[in-house]
């Protein structure tokens, strides 16, 4: 699917400036309070058949690290955990975005040299003259042209669902979050840290657009 958008929209989505940033829209709900006990967490894959994936194991460790920063501990198994956290993640094949933008053309707007010539008439007859005058040139925008940029925009989605555990039995859900991020990086592993950081920026009540700076190899 091809879309025509302005360059301003592209920059608004993928970020610009000396350090790239990941923009993530976060929506979260919770029954946790500042007085809620922390306890230990164990992260599982959603769907479960991803649990053997090396990619999932990497994200599992990163997500557990985020909980550690919030005062939780890492459980070695679901049977010994106080909470189980279901992690879902996905990235699409990308959408082609064609952007158009205006490029100014710079040139001389005034000044420089000018040639003059003419004829002078008097009582004794006439005489021709010619000469050149000079003034300091000034420069500015004298026109514009249109440029085109083509990018592939990827949609990345992360869902986190946290449940109480009682002797290994799953109980009530206490936290849920959905994070949607769009950008030109098509590798989930390159942006997952920034997405997790965005979700936990005001844990457990992060909502709205969150921007996290990062370094990427996409």
Across the structure, where does each feature detected by a protein language model lie?
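C-terminal/domain-edge helix-coil "capping" segments
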Residues: 16-33, 141, 145-218
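Surface-exposed short loop/turn segments
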Residues: 88-166
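A structural "domain/chain start" motif
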Residues: 16-70, 75, 80-83, 90-99, ...
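Noncatalytic linker/hinge segments flanking ATPase motor cores
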Residues: 82-89, 131, 136, 198-206, ...
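Soluble periplasmic/extracytoplasmic beta-strand elements of cell-envelope proteins
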Residues: 41-44, 84-88, 159-161, 174-178
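Short, low-complexity, polar/charged sequence segments that are solvent-exposed and flexible
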Residues: 60-65, 103-108, 179-181, 194-199
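Sec-dependent bacterial lipoprotein signal peptides
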Residues: 1-16
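Residues embedded in well-ordered secondary-structure elements
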Residues: 5, 74, 149-151
């Amino acid at each position: 699917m091809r879309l025509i958008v302005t360059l301003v929209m592209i920059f608004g989505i993928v970020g610009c400036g000396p350090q790239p940033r990941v923009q993530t829209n976060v929506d979260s709900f919770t029954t946790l309070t500042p007085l809620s006990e922390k306890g230990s967490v164990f992260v599982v894959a959603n769907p479960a058949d991803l649990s053997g994936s090396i990619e999932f194991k990497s994200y599992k460790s990163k997500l557990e690290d985020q909980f550690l920063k919030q005062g939780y501990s890492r459980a070695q198994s679901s049977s010994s955990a106080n909470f189980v956290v279901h992690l879902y993640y996905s990235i699409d094949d990308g959408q082609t975005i064609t952007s158009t933008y205006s490029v100014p053309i710079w040139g001389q707007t005034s000044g420089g040299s000018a040639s003059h010539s003419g004829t002078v008439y008097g009582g004794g007859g006439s005489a021709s003259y010619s000469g050149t005058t000079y003034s300091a040139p000034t420069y500015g925008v004298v026109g514009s042209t249109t440029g085109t940029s083509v990018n592939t925009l990827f949609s990345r989605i992360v869902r986190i669902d946290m449940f109480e555990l009682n002797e290994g039995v799953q109980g009530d859900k206490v936290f849920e979050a959905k994070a949607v991020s769009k950008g030109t990086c098509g590798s989930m592993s390159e942006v997952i840290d920034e997405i997790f950081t965005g979700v936990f920026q005001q844990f457990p009540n992060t909502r709205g657009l969150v921007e996290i700076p990062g370094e990427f190899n996409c």
